[in-house]
């Protein structure tokens, strides 16, 4: 193989990888009645904001195997018990990980990563009230479990709705839990 052919093939490979990584970060927004800010990332995950129990059957029809709820039961509009019942009635797994924005608990991140990477839970729908907590947790998962670089994960999290309040928590967790 000549040096020119080798270089051409190498460049083609690099462009293919760059294109694949850009597609991996693409966020597809959909309107789903009863779900605010629904965003599909890939075949294994979607994130969203407030989700009414009546919307759960539609998520099941879309192929989701689990719902991971990051809302506190005490939040206005949260229907944790009814949502859990709706998820189980739709034949999906329900994981409730109450994420307190005022004092985020790093242990909760460990539980989230364990839940979202469990093959039986894929594809998973992760939500909170507005999408910020879901975006922060997903960003952490991308760096810690998927070994993405921080900037790539931050770009994706920003597209999902990462907010200024949770960005420092996510970055601190990443910096203290990666080598």
Regions found by a protein language model. Give the residues of each.
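Hydrophobic h-region of N-terminal signal peptides that target proteins for export
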Residues: 13-22
């Amino acid at each position: 193989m000549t040096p020119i052919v080798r270089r051409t093939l190498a460049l083609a490979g690099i462009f293919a990888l760059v294109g694949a990584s850009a597609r991996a970060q693409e966020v597809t927004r959909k309107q789903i009645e009863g779900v605010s800010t629904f965003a599909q990332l890939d075949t294994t995950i979607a994130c969203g904001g407030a989700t009414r129990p009546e919307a759960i059957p539609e998520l099941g029809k879309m192929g989701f195997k689990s719902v991971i709820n990051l809302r506190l039961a005490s939040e206005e509009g949260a229907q944790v018990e009814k949502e859990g019942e709706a998820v189980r009635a739709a034949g999906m797994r329900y994981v409730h990980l109450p994420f307190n924005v005022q004092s985020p608990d790093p242990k909760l991140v460990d539980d989230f990563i364990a839940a979202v990477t469990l093959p039986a839970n894929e594809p998973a729908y992760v939500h909170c009230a507005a999408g910020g907590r879901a975006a922060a947790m997903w960003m952490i998962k991308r760096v810690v479990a998927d070994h993405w670089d921080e900037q790539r994960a931050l770009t994706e999290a920003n597209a999902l709705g990462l907010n200024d309040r949770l960005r420092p928590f996510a970055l601190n967790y990443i910096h203290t839990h990666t080598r």
